[in-house]
Each structure stands twice: as structure tokens, then as C-alpha cells.
Amino acid sequence: MVPAATPVATLLGVQITIQYFEGCPNWEVADERVRLALAHLGMGATDVTRELIDTPEKAVAAGFHGSPTILVNGRDPFADRGSPVGLSCRLFTTPHGLAGSPTVDQLMHAIESAGSRSSTGGA
């Protein structure tokens, strides 16, 4: 039997981390949108980990592509190949143009895709 306090996303194998640095306001928008996406997916009780990246060394060690970086099961579903690592604000391509955070729909898709990969054993 699964304990009642276990988040639904954890049961589905989905873990979410928002990496950020204090100088970028977009991580708070991303945090709100992640919560909305989880709520729309019926996963509103899911814990979201926040990880402060506050030095260039930590940015390199974490493979931090800018704030906010949203990791779903440890993977950045929005990373562009060759995007620089470092302490900077990040831009995302959305259906409405460039923005400081993915849309709720984009986040829902990323979370659902990660859950599907987890349940089928895919990477």
C-alpha cells in the first residue's frame, strides 16, 4: 500500500526541479506555471524542488542553461543543443514568441512525456 502523503507525480516517476538564481525574476513565473500545469494534470500535491544556483562553478557543475531551468526527472526538456551554461536569464520559444518561462501547456506536455517514458521504462 502506498502512503497517502506520496505525491502523485512521484508515483508516476516524475520529479520536478526548478533551478534558478536570485537575479532573474522569471523563475517565479515558471514556478507558478509548473504548479498550474501539475494542477491541470491532477498532480497538484506534487513537491517541486527549488535549487539555487549562485556561483559560476555551480552553474557549470549543474549544466545550468540559465534561469529558470526546469528539470523533469533530471532532464531539461527545453534545452537547446549548444546553449551556453552560466548565470543568465533564459528565454524559451513559446507559441506566442520568446518568453521567460514555458507556457502551462508546454509544461504539461513535458510532464506527461516524462511520465510516459517512466511508465514504459524509456529514457
What do these predicted ranges mean?
Residues 57-63:
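Acidic pyrophosphate-coordinating catalytic loop
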Residues 3-5, 24, 86-91:
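Functionally engaged cysteine thiol sites
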Residues 64-71, 87:
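Structural micro-motif
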Residues 44-56:
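Thiol-based oxidoreductase modules, predominantly thioredoxin-like and allied folds used
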Residues 7-39:
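Local sequence-structure signature of Cys/Sec-based thiol-disulfide redox active-site neighborhoods
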Residues 1-14, 28, 102-123:
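Iron-sulfur (Fe-S) cluster-binding modules
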Residues 75-114:
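Non-catalytic, surface beta->alpha helical segment in thiol-disulfide oxidoreductase systems
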